[in-house]
UniProtKB/Swiss-Prot annotation:
UniProt-listed PROSITE patterns: MRP
Known role: Binds and transfers iron-sulfur (Fe-S) clusters to target apoproteins. Can hydrolyze ATP.
UniProt-annotated binding residues for ATP: G105, K106, G107, G108, V109, G110, K111, S112
Family: Belongs to the Mrp/NBP35 ATP-binding proteins family.
Name this protein carries in UniProt: Iron-sulfur cluster carrier protein
SUPFAM superfamilies in UniProt: P-loop containing nucleoside triphosphate hydrolases (SSF52540)
Superkingdom as given in the UniProt entry: Bacteria
CDD domains assigned: Mrp_NBP35 (cd02037)
Molecular function as annotated in GO: 4 iron, 4 sulfur cluster binding; ATP binding; ATP hydrolysis activity; ATP-dependent FeS chaperone activity; metal ion binding
Family annotation (Pfam families): ParA
Gene symbol of the encoding locus: mrp
GO terms, biological process: iron-sulfur cluster assembly
Length: 318
């Protein structure tokens, strides 16, 4: 038979659910397929342990329906319960009225392009806007905005670069082109803190923060240390993308950050309907479903205005 794919595994487990309503696909991670042998982890934190063996047997039975599947290995994991600590006072960013995160569960979904589009759209609507490129894994905002200069420092404060009437600051300004960024979580979080707090913003209505993909140290640091107004989540229609986004939704809901809405990018390129499904399931607005527009990619490459090609309706959400 042909090699197995992750989507086949997810499809077979799609409707299996725990008694509390949690779908098995929401708590699966680390799917490994080798020579048609399959292995994955299931996070059983907070789930009745009496159900675990039953769910495991059901999953194995469903997976064995796949012709030619080999050995099936399921590992159960459980997050440690962390004692609640007294909440630290959160920081406001000087001269910034609202801070909006743009996040995604995984990389490669067009999050930076959407971040730039949101910033340019708000600027077009006569708001004073800034954008922070906090994506340490691939800072692309300077390129999208056509910036080649390094910010100046005056009196110990970083002066953001202005492009397309938007104030821009990026980790990419301080890293040589094509250099790998190898930072541990605390160092990366400290750098983001400096980008936010040491930068001299000029009375902004909105500060858009292009976050790294996933739910790592930087996300937790931002949520715990700053007054934030909300997050826009970017996804694609695939089921695998949906699984990653569910983890992001869970994080933001647990830490009480309002989820402004979901933007489904590349909506016509992949099978699935992730954005609409997540919107209905979690009662989160679906801001837009954006098809693949080759001219958008070209505009990013050539640092052209994105709002000439696509406009988002943001007024009812922000």
């Amino acid at each position: 038979m042909a090699d197995l794919h992750q989507n086949q595994i997810i499809d077979k487990l799609h409707n299996i659910a725990f008694k509390d309503g949690t779908f098995l696909k929401q708590v699966i991670s680390n799917i490994i397929i080798k020579h048609n042998n399959v292995g994955f982890s299931i996070d059983i934190s907070g789930i009745d342990k009496l159900e675990v063996e039953e769910i495991k047997n059901t999953a194995i039975k469903k997976l064995n329906e796949i012709v030619g599947i080999g050995k099936i290995t399921i590992v159960f994991t459980e997050s440690k319960t962390v004692e609640k600590k007294p909440q630290k006072p959160k920081h406001f960013v000087e001269n910034v009225k609202k801070i909006i995160l743009v996040a995604s569960g995984k990389g490669g979904v067009g999050k930076s392009t959407i971040s730039a589009l949101i910033a340019q759209q708000l600027s077009l609507e006569n708001h004073r806007v800034g954008i922070v490129d906090a994506d340490i894994y691939g800072p692309s905002i300077p390129h999208i905005f056509g910036i080649n200069e390094v910010p100046q420092t005056v009196g110990g404060r970083i002066i953001p670069v202005r492009a397309k009437n938007i104030e821009v600051i990026s980790i990419g300004f301080f890293v040589k082109n094509y250099s790998a960024i190898i930072w541990r979580g605390p160092m990366a979080s400290k750098t983001i803190y400096q980008l936010l707090s040491v930068t001299k913003w000029d009375n902004l209505d909105y500060l858009i923060i292009d976050m790294p993909p996933g739910t790592g140290d930087i996300h937790l640091s931002m949520l715990e240390n700053y007054h934030l107004n909300g997050v826009v989540i970017v996804t694609t229609p695939q089921k695998m993308s949906e699984i990653d986004v569910v983890r992001s939704i869970d994080l933001y809901q647990k830490l009480n950050l309002p989820i402004i809405g979901i933007i489904e990018n590349m909506s016509d390129l992949f099978d699935g309907n992730s954005g609409s499904h997540l919107s209905q399931k979690y009662n989160i607005p679906l801001i837009a479903q954006i098809p693949v527009i080759p001219k958008i990619a070209n505009a990013c490459d050539k640092s052209l205005p994105l709002t000439d090609l696509l406009k988002l309706s943001l007024k009812e959400y922000l």
